[in-house]
């Protein structure tokens, strides 16, 4: 990962984060990945970035000759929340790496750094939603995430802060 760097996500990264949200929402190679604009027009996904960055939001962007991946988390309310919602004090994360750069360890590093940040910020856990057949599920499980609920073909997974990476 020569010359690969990781930096905090900023307001200026909004468009790239929207693109990454599309990558995470439709990860199957045989399906068309929605554009950032399409993702933001879909209420199911727009909530992951609405008003970015809000108080408590945290994210990272991986860069090597331009952005290649991103991961971020935010908390939600009982009445307005994402697919991997657990409780109001557990942020839900979103993560994606551009297709041409997958399987290089970028996602693992983004995930590890985001977990570390959530612990440093005092969160008791971090959650996510993943399709049961998504290969990224293995990354999440190897990073300490465990399934807590199933919704159709998707799993809500949680990783408690006490577990070391």
PLM features: residue spans?
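Conserved N-terminal entry element of GNAT/NAT acetyltransferase domains
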Residues: 1-12, 24, 163-165
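Hydrophobic pocket/interface hotspot
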Residues: 17
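Active-site rim helix/loop that mediates acceptor-substrate recognition in acyltransferases
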Residues: 34-59, 64
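Short hydrophobic/aromatic beta-strand element in the GNAT-like acyltransferase core
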Residues: 56-61, 70, 94, 154-156
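Conserved acyl-donor/pantetheine-binding loop and adjacent beta-alpha core of acyl/acetyltransferases
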Residues: 63-64, 68-95
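C-terminal "cap" of GNAT-fold acetyltransferases
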Residues: 87-91, 124-137, 141-165
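A short, internal acetyl-CoA/4′-phosphopantetheine-binding micro-motif in the GNAT/acyltransferase core
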Residues: 92-103, 130
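Conserved acetyl-CoA-binding loop-helix of GNAT-fold acetyltransferases
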Residues: 94, 103-120, 141-142
């Amino acid at each position: 990962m020569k010359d690969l760097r990781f930096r905090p996500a900023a307001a200026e990264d909004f468009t790239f984060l929207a693109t990454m949200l599309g990558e995470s929402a439709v990860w199957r190679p045989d399906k068309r990945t929605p554009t950032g604009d399409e993702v933001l027009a879909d209420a199911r996904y727009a909530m992951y970035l609405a008003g970015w960055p809000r108080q408590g939001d945290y994210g990272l962007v991986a860069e090597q000759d331009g952005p290649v991946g991103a991961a971020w988390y935010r908390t939600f309310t009982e009445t307005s929340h994402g697919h991997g919602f657990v409780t109001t004090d557990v942020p839900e994360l979103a993560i994606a790496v551009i297709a041409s750069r997958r399987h290089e360890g970028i996602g693992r590093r983004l995930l590890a750094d985001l977990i570390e940040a959530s612990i440093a910020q005092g969160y008791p856990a971090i959650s996510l939603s993943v399709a049961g057949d998504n290969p990224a599920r293995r990354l999440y499980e190897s990073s300490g995430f465990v399934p807590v609920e199933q919704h159709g073909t998707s799993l809500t997974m949680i990783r408690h802060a006490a577990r070391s990476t």
